[in-house]
Amino acid sequence: MNITVLHGTLSSEPKHRLLPSGDELITYEVTTELADGAASVPVAWLRPSRPPAVATGDAVVVIGHVRRRFFRAASGAASRTEVVASTVLKPDSRRLARLLNTSAETIQRGVVGPAQIPPAA
């Protein structure tokens, strides 16, 4: 199971690109706080459904999965690990609680199996 939830701050402006396929791609750099400092996490969102209006310094929550891409660079073979977003939200979004609950249920089903999950009250 590969589910990622990030909460952090945009460290640069979102970059919008139109791919040759006609699909839109938005990339973000999200800085997350760690116990021993901070980490910058690249995020890619393909065909965004409802991208939030965000700018450098804004807090965001990203729900998605981790992917490692391999490609050729001038120096030879290279790779990049990034989070592929299914959703990017502002932390105050009303949709956030519902999406986090859905993610938690998906994780629980993957860990304990669907037959063992008690029904929601």
Predicted regions located by residue number:
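Single-stranded nucleic acid-binding surfaces, predominantly the OB-fold ssDNA-binding core
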Residues: 1-121
